[in-house]
Amino acid sequence: MKYLIQKKKQLRNFQKNNIVKTNKLKVKSKTENLSVIRDFVSSYAAEARIEQNIIENIILAVDEACTNIIKHAYHSVPDGEIIIKLKLSGKKFIVTITDYGNSFSPEKIPEPDLQKYYRQKKVGGLGMYLMKTLMDDVEYHSVPGKYNEVLLSKNIKVDKSNVRH
């Protein structure tokens, strides 16, 4: 399992009493790296003392985005690169996911009919819907032939039971 982790590369900027802290992870576009990505997001969010249910939502949204990148942007070719940047700025948790695979048009993806989806026992196809449901903001930027970027942000609450006094 070959992947590069640049986990301890942190930038600290002080802006009006808010610490902005960024972490970065680079992995190859292999499904076995999804667990590495989940652990990376989980440990960063837990260190920031974000409530557990919010952490779980963020992890699921990131997992969906990265799965879509592996399957659709890279067509399951394992040597593509995925870069995940995590940033905590004030009361906002921001995830930026960059890839260099094929781009797509998210506006062409229709809202799913969940009842029909369930009746037809479909598998897959709910990634964008889940990301939009779990996160407060989902953006997609693409420079075709160069890179694609998914920006996920979540307004957060700190779990006060975990705050050290």
Features from the language model and the residues they span:
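Conserved short strand/loop->alpha-helix "switch" segment adjacent to the catalytic nucleotide/phosphoryl-transfer site
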Residues: 41-63, 120-122
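Conserved beta-strand-loop-beta-strand hairpin that lines the nucleotide-binding pocket
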Residues: 2-24, 70-165
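Short acidic/polar alpha-helix capping motifs at helix-coil junctions
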Residues: 7-8, 34-35, 46-49, 58, ...
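Conserved polar catalytic motif of the HATPase_c/GHKL fold
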Residues: 64, 68
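Short, structured helix-loop boundary elements
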Residues: 31-34, 55, 59, 79, ...
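Helix-loop-beta hinge of the Bergerat
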Residues: 18-52
